[in-house]
């Protein structure tokens, strides 16, 4: 019985430590959440919460361009394709942090590969995506 209690305690400790390792204020977490919303779910509104400055302006322009299509009932879920992304690099640029991502987008009959450069700045103690550059690979 003591062995079982110790195993349960160790399992609980491992789960607690694993969940604590996800620092939701870290720039990696913010960048990954932005990429998940913007590229994988194709949901500019959800991605917007992770942005500031130029990235927010970019999303506002995209939301304005898609407003009429969305008003007709076309949703982000319908727009979403099968998207796989992988963070490949982290670089400092002055006070900012840049993350590179490889992004693969599979449509019904084709596949696209893109490279995304996602730059974050610490604005009032919160990391925000401030610039996004996407290139075909």
PLM feature spans:
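Short, low-complexity N-terminal intrinsically disordered segments enriched in polar/charged residues
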Residues: 4, 18-40
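Short solvent-exposed beta->alpha transition segments
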Residues: 44-96
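Structured segments of extracytoplasmic/periplasmic soluble domains
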Residues: 33, 37-41, 50-54, 123
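Low-complexity, intrinsically disordered short peptide segments enriched in small/polar/basic residues
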Residues: 5, 12, 32, 80-81, ...
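Exposed beta-sheet edge and beta->alpha loop/turn motif
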Residues: 89-137
């Amino acid at each position: 019985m003591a062995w079982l209690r110790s195993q349960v305690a160790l399992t609980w400790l491992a789960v607690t430590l694993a969940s604590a390792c996800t620092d939701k204020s870290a720039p990696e977490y913010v960048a990954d959440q932005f990429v998940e919303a913007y590229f994988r779910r194709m949901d500019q509104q959800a991605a917007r919460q992770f942005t500031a400055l130029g990235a927010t302006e970019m999303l506002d322009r995209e939301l304005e361009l898609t407003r009429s299509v969305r008003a007709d009932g076309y949703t982000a879920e319908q727009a979403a394709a099968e998207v796989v992304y992988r963070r490949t690099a982290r670089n400092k640029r002055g006070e900012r942090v840049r993350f590179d991502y490889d992004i693969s987008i599979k449509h019904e009959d084709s596949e696209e590969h893109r490279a995304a450069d996602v730059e974050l700045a610490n604005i009032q103690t919160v990391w925000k995506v401030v610039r996004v550059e996407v290139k075909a690979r």
